[in-house]
Amino acid sequence: MFTTKKPLLLLFFLGTINLSLCEQERNAEEERRDDDEMDVEVEKRFLPIVAGLAANFLPKIVCKITKKC
């Protein structure tokens, strides 16, 4: 009976270690993905502000350069 328990315990132990390593790798991938998503969110918030400022000041700058206001 003990001879059959020993391999089963070994398989259980190795499986537990394998699952632990997979979980750590998955968590690391999620953290990297979260950083990428935060960068995209910052870009989405930053670009409309820049576009709005450009839309306000570009006609004024063109008007002053060409002096056709």
UniProtKB/Swiss-Prot annotation:
It comes from the Eukaryota. One of its GO terms (biological process) is defense response to bacterium. It is found in: Secreted. Pfam families: Antimicrobial_1, FSAP_sig_propep. Residues 1-22 form the signal peptide. Keywords: Amphibian defense peptide, Antibiotic, Antimicrobial, Cleavage on pair of basic residues, Cytolysis, Disulfide bond, Fungicide, Hemolysis, Secreted, Signal. Expressed by the skin glands. The keyword Secreted applies. Residues 23-43 form a propeptide. One of its GO terms (cellular component) is extracellular region. The keyword Signal applies. InterPro entries: Antimicrobial_frog_1 (IPR012520), Frog_antimicrobial_propeptide (IPR004275). Disulfide bonds join 63-69. Belongs to the frog skin active peptide (FSAP) family. Brevinin subfamily. Antimicrobial peptide active against a variety of Gram-positive and some Gram-negative bacterial strains. Has antifungal activity against C.albicans ATCC 10231 and a slime mold isolate. Has hemolytic activity against human erythrocytes. This is Brevinin-1CG2.
